Amino acid sequence: GLDFGAKTVGVAITDASGTLAQRKEIIRRQRENALRKTYARIQELIQEYEISCIVLGLPLHLDGSVSERANKTLLFQVELERRTGLQVIMQDERLTSVEAEDLMREAGIPKSDWKAQIDMIAAELILQDYLNHRDRYQ
């Protein structure tokens, strides 16, 4: 599962049974469009964990309309499919950042550490939502 942001990509993977999402890492980049190393790291993760498809969060507005970030995410999806040869499934990610903040607050994580973890937690939530409802994609 991926949470594609302006300068980061949060990454989550599933457990061996494919039922539980686990946060993995955050891929950082210096500039928004500097994606070469991001694609390379995703390729490494695909090989390391034998990933067969990718779930990518789609940041729609609350009313369901497409945001500027969603347009950039859709372009990222196309390029990711081209580079990896894998299907990239788009998953609605509305309110995942709010949910991630709630989880960090409940876990007692200091606010100063939130920025370092929010994208990875959001990726985990995106992937878990897909896993919980994957029958609607088949």
Task: Please provide the spans of the model-predicted regions.
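Short glycine-aspartate micro-motif
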Residues: 1-3
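Phosphate- and other anionic-substrate recognition elements at nucleic-acid/protein interfaces
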Residues: 7-138
